[in-house]
């Protein structure tokens, strides 16, 4: 009790002996330590502090520095002391330690967040790659299955073909018949004398004969197919040649018909042109007129023309043909029909009748082409009484024209427009 309440004599002696400066230094240091402890208790600390370790490290560094100071010169010692004091100041403060641990915690949390985000992105990429690769793998699997099916079908067809060939060979006549199973047994039989020279040679010969027979069967089968194909090709070629021949014959016929029609048109045009020239050069005589006055109401005028039977036109102009005989006869037997007979004046036609005959004989015409003239040859020949007869053909002809009037006009020279080719 005395120790706690009152001061002992030992403490009093210490106070007397010790200096006040040392006591003040100790007190200040003690106050600092107590302040640090209070602050540590009030603050929030997530993890345990390592003050003891830091203090031990600092003590160790101080000891090493002191040992080195003894060995080094004074200049180096002063610089080292300054560095050590700075390090001690930085590390000794409790705020620096807290900040250091807080930065570490923040960095760990942020790095964890980044790593999780990267992991999620990688998982999404992996899933997409798996989907794409899965589709590609499925497509490849489908293609491989199709190829395998096609190969299996081909193999089945080949096997069926070989079986059919073998059946044909077996059903062939006995000269070609051979025992396949016996030869196979001889090929694969295990006997002691198989490797003898005679048996070995016989086996080789049998194999050669079998291969020859199989080749013959194959060649016969393919030869039949080739013959059928060649026959079909020949039939197609014959049909094509027939069609070409028919087309050529039709073309030749159409061309010949066109040439004939063009030739006829040309001949007609040449004839009309030649007549125009000849009519222009010919000097007609209007004096050759024979007027008759007959008591009968009906009179006939017959113009008889005679020509040589020739198919070609003469090279010289037909001036000789102009001297054809034109005879006027009356139907009554009273009047003699002689070219030299003279008629009295009272029987001659009057001028009014002549003018009327002229208007009837030469109607007003429009210019027409040779083709239209030929088309309307018969109608216009009946209408125009002026041109009674004309023949430039190959044979003789006689034309007669009937008049209801009681006079006969004079025959005027015809023009090419009044010419009608009668066939």
Swiss-Prot record:
PROSITE patterns: IQ. The keyword Nucleus does not apply. It comes from the Eukaryota. GO terms for cellular component: cytoplasm; cytoskeleton; plasma membrane. Residues 235-252 are annotated as: Calmodulin-binding. Keywords: Calmodulin-binding, Cell membrane, Coiled coil, Cytoplasm, Cytoskeleton, Membrane, Repeat. This is Protein IQ-DOMAIN 16. The lineage of its organism: Eukaryota, Viridiplantae, Streptophyta, Embryophyta, Tracheophyta. The gene is IQD16.
């Amino acid at each position: 009790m005395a120790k706690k309440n009152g001061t002992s004599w030992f403490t009093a002696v210490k106070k007397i002996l010790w200096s006040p400066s040392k006591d003040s230094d100790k007190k200040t240091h003690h106050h600092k330590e107590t302040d640090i402890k209070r602050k540590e208790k009030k603050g929030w600390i997530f993890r345990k502090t390592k003050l003891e370790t830091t203090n031990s490290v600092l003590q160790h560094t101080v000891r090493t520095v002191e040992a080195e100071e003894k060995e080094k010169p004074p200049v180096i010692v002063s610089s080292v002391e300054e560095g050590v004091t700075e390090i001690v100041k930085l590390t000794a403060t409790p705020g620096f330690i807290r900040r250091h641990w807080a930065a570490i915690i923040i960095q760990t949390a942020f790095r964890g967040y980044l790593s999780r985000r990267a992991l999620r992105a990688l998982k999404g990429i992996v899933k997409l790659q798996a989907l794409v690769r899965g589709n590609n793998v499925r497509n490849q699997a489908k293609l491989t299955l199709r190829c395998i099916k096609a190969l299996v079908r081909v193999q089945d067809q080949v096997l069926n073909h070989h079986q059919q060939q073998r059946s044909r060979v077996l059903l062939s006549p006995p000269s070609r018949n051979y025992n396949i199973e016996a030869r196979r047994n001889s090929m694969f039989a295990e006997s002691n004398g198989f490797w003898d020279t005679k048996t070995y040679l016989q086996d080789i010969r049998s194999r050669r004969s079998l291969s020859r027979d199989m080749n013959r069967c194959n060649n016969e089968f393919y030869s039949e197919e080739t013959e059928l194909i060649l026959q079909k090709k020949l039939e197609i070629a014959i049909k094509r040649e027939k069609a070409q021949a028919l087309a050529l014959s039709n073309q030749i016929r159409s061309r010949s018909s066109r040439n004939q029609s063009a030739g006829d048109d040309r001949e007609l045009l040449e004839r009309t042109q030649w007549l125009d020239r000849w009519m222009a050069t010919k000097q007609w005589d209007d004096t050759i007129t024979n007027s008759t006055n007959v008591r009968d109401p009906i009179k006939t005028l017959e113009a008889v023309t005679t020509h040589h039977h020739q198919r070609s036109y003469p090279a010289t102009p037909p001036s000789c043909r102009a001297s054809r005989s034109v005879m006027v006869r009356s139907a009554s037997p009273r009047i003699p029909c002689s070219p030299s007979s003279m008629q009295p004046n009272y029987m001659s036609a009057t001028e009014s009748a002549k003018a009327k005959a002229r208007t009837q004989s030469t109607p007003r015409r429009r210019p027409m082409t040779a083709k239209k003239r030929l088309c309307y040859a018969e109608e216009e020949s009946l209408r125009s009484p002026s041109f009674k007869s004309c023949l430039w053909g190959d044979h003789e002809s006689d034309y007669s024209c009937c008049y209801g009037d009681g006079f006969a006009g004079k025959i005027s020279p015809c023009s090419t427009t009044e010419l009608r080719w009668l066939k």
